[in-house]
Each structure stands twice: as structure tokens, then as C-alpha cells.
Amino acid sequence: MKKKFMLLALIVLGSVSAFAEETPVLELKQTVVTSDSFGTSVRETTKNMTVVNAKEIKEKGAKTIADALRGVPGVVVREMDGSSPTIDLRGSGATAQFNTVILLDGIPVSGLAGFNLNSVPVEEISKIEVLQGAGAVMYGDGAIGGVVNIITKAPTNKTVYGGAGLEVGSWRTIRENVHLGGKVGDKLLLNASYSGSTSKDYRDRSPQYENKKDKTDSLWLRGKYLLDNGSIAINYNHSEDKDYYTGYLEKKQFDKNPRQVGSWSGYTYGINDIVNAKYNQKINDKIDIFLTAGYYHNKNKFQNNSTSEYFIRPEVKYTYAKDSYVTLGLDYRDGKREFKEDVLVNSVSQKAPDDKRESFAGYITNK
């Protein structure tokens, strides 16, 4: 009897072994974390990082960054008509917008005036990195909850390429995008793209806005120059976003007609200009340098104020052993928001004081 059981066990083990030999190994593509300036794979990073790539965004059918982030563990997206979506990391609640740093290609844009996530078309996104928890403290004040880093598509090393797209949907929605890029000589890569959309809401509009449409336009110009052991990249983005909204409904009103106009209506109109530049160079086997700089300007035409912010971050990486290195870096930010009109304070009209913020920090990390 024992011999029969032993023979059966050998046959089963042999079959499992043969199956294992025949089954091909699926090797997943490595994901590199770009919030680390010098690049670290997700497997190697010790941070609580989630990456949503362009393929996943497309498979979700996401039309906005808010759509793309829904379903990410630990992330809550709140939206209110007429305002930018708020990303809540780690249950920050009402203070979420002050506890989450938004980066666009590594440049902080959620400063004095905040940043409208809907101004970045999903067609322009390569991936979105979400960093939650204490690992985000190196990104400065306002990162208690975490960091959302939006990485846009870089110029491709091809002679000539391009494409265009058009979508039509409910409520007179039209989305269009077009891009064109190419290589000039052996080292210069260029890319230009445009994305736009117009739409009317599910909700009805008040008479003065009845024939108006929500409208977004976004133009991107990108250039990258390849060095022998590094590169220089410059990106420019101009975007305009106009959104019409109406107020809330009481329950009786909603039950009767959920599409009807609320007790008030209004609109927001924002214009953004963003420039960022990156330089990286490998000096030798032990030393790498990296420089990130950016400028962000926002003009709110509805509230009649404007915001300007500057940012620069130089970093040096010293590799002292295999897979071990020290990174030394500095952060400098300078921002100002100016109000063009008086505001009401305790029922008294007065000139609003301008907001100013300047910060400087240094850091050193060891891996």
C-alpha cells in the first residue's frame, strides 16, 4: 500500500515540475518613480507609492485627473461644481487642500491660489504618482497628507510622429486633441500638442448663462536636448478653463426635477501659464547633478486676482557603494498673490492685503 502511495506522489510531483518548466514566466515592465529626481523603481522605494499609468487611465475611461485617481487606495476625490477637485490623502477631511502637495512634472503648483486639476487633459499624462504618509515631508510644508505628482508625456525620440482625436458625447460635449513631434538633428527633440473641450452641464442654467458652455483649452510646447551623459528639458503650458455652475437644490426640488436651476448661478474663469526646466548630468561614476526650476502664473478673471510663484531645486547625488548613495538638495520657493478689487470684510469694503510666501529648505537622504 505504501509503495502505491509513494508511486502516486512521485507521479504528481513530476507532473507539477514538468508544468512549472513549461509555464512561461511573465516579466512585468519596471516602473520608475519620478518623484525621486534620480529615478527609483517602485520595488526599491521605501515610500508608500501608488502609480497610475497612461494605460490604466485609458482603461478606466477617465476624462479628468479626478476620474483617474478614483479607486486608488487611501485617496478620496471630492468635486463641487464650479471649483477644482480636492484630493484627500490619509483622511485629511476639510483641510485636505492644505495638506496635499500637487506637483506637475516635479514642480509644485498647489501654492497660494491652489491648482485646478481639470486644467491638465488626461491625453497629456504619462502617469500619476501618489505618495502618502511621512515619506512626503521632503516636499516641504503642506505635504502632511502626501504628494500627487502628475507626469506629462515627454518628447519621443522619433524622426516624425503625430496624431489627432475627436470625441462627441452627451450634453453637447466635444473633445478634441492633436499632437505633433519630431527630432531635429541627432540631439534635439520637439513636441507640440493641443487639447480642448466644450460641454453643457446636466443641470439647467439660469437665463444669463443659458447659452454658455463649459470650455477648456490647453496648449503644450516641449523640448529636450540630449547630452552625452544627461539632458536639458523645457516645457511650457498655457491653459484656460471656464466653468459655469448653479446652486444646490432642496430635497423637494430635487425629487421634482433634479436638473432644474438652483438658487444662484455663477462661473469661474482661470488662466494658467507654467514653465518648467530640468537639467541632469552624470559627472562621473560617483557624482550626478540634477536641477529643477519652474514658474507658475495663475489669473482668476472672475475674482480678479493673480498669483505668481517661482521654484528651484538643485540636487547632488554621490554614490559611495553599489546601490547605495547620498542625495543632498535645496528647495527655494517664492510666491505672491495680488487682489485687484476690494473685498468685503465684516460688511466693509476694503483693499485685500496681498498674500506673500517665501520658503527655503535643505535636505540630505541616504539609501
Residue ranges of model-derived segments:
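Face-selective signature of the C-terminal outer-membrane beta-barrel domain
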Residues: 226-240, 267-367
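Transmembrane beta-strand segments of Gram-negative outer membrane beta-barrel proteins
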Residues: 29-30, 127, 146, 152-168, ...
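Sequence/structural signature of outer-membrane beta-barrel proteins
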Residues: 38, 169-173, 198-206, 241-243, ...
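N-terminal Sec signal peptide and the immediately downstream disordered periplasmic leader
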Residues: 1-60, 66-72, 181-182, 217-219, ...
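Periplasmic-side early beta-strands and strand-to-turn transitions of outer-membrane beta-barrels
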Residues: 137, 149, 157-159, 165-167, ...
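Extracytoplasmic beta-strand/coil segments of soluble accessory domains associated
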Residues: 66-107
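Short acidic/polar hinge/loop motifs at secondary-structure boundaries
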Residues: 107-133
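Residues that define the transmembrane beta-barrel architecture of outer-membrane proteins
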Residues: 144, 167, 172-176, 215-219, ...
